[in-house]
Amino acid sequence: MPKMKTDRGAAKRFKKTGSGGFKCKHANKRHILTKKTTKRKRHLRAPGMVAKPDLARVSAMLPYA
């Protein structure tokens, strides 16, 4: 059986944690930042976690993570 391919887009966006979850960046931090509050931008800086319903899909895209 051939090796499974890693989804390269997903590999650049998600990192596996020690407990089996996936870290990702928050959305809404690229442009049009002047109207967003400092507090909102500060909270978007922290790493986000992939939600439970999406874990299986992300795991399938990253078979060797």
From Swiss-Prot:
User: Which Pfam families does this UniProt record tie to the protein?
Assistant: Ribosomal_L35p
- Paired cysteines (S-S): none
Q: Which GO terms describe its biological process?
A: translation
Could you name the Gene Ontology cellular component terms for this entry?
cytosolic large ribosomal subunit
Top-level taxon in the UniProt lineage: Bacteria
Record's compositionally biased regions (Basic and acidic residues):
1-10
List UniProt keywords, sorted A-Z. Ribonucleoprotein, Ribosomal protein
Q: Which residues lie within the region annotated Disordered?
A: 1-24
Instruction: Give any GO molecular function from the UniProt entry.
Output: structural constituent of ribosome
Quote the NCBIfam families the UniProt record gives: rpmI_bact (TIGR00001)
State the similarity comment. Answer: Belongs to the bacterial ribosomal protein bL35 family.
Which protein are we looking at?
Answer: Large ribosomal subunit protein bL35
